[in-house]
Swiss-Prot record:
PANTHER family: UPF0178 PROTEIN YAII. NCBIfam families: PRK00124.1. Belongs to the UPF0178 family. This is UPF0178 protein DP1304. InterPro entries: UPF0178. It comes from the Bacteria. It comes from Desulfotalea psychrophila (strain LSv54 / DSM 12343).
Amino acid sequence: MKIWVDADAAPVAIKEILYKLADKRKVETIFVANRVLKLPRSQHLHFRLVAAGADVADGEIVRLLKKGDLVITADIPLASLVVEKGGTALNPRGELYTKENIAERLSSRDFMQELRDGGVETGGAPPFSAKDKQRFANAIDRILARLR
C-alpha cells in the first residue's frame, strides 16, 4: 500500500502529519505536484514533479494508483476516480470518500460550480482549523489500521 498526496493544494499541517506518519508507519508516501516541494529526508517520502496544467497531477496519481492505495485530496473528481479504481480517498479535513457518498459529493460540487459559473457568489470553504487537522489525523490512523 502507498499513500499518494495531491500536494499542490494540501495544507502545510497535513503535509507535516504525513511526513511523520510515513516514517512511523513505514509507508511509502508520494507527493505529486506541479512545483518543487522540499521534503524531509526519509526513505519513505518521495516526490513526483508533473507539468503545470489542470488535472495533470490528478492524472499522474490515477495512472500510478493501485487497488488498496490511499490518496489524500480535496479534489472531488479525483476522489471519484480513486474510488472507482479501488483506492481509498481522504480529504485534508478528514472526510472519507466512499462508493456510497462520492456521487452525492460530485453532484453537490457540480451544482455549486454551475452557480459560480452563473455569477452567484457561493463563498468558499472555511479556513483550515485545528479541528480539521485533528479529524484528519484520527481518520488516517483508522484507515491505515484497516488497510495494513
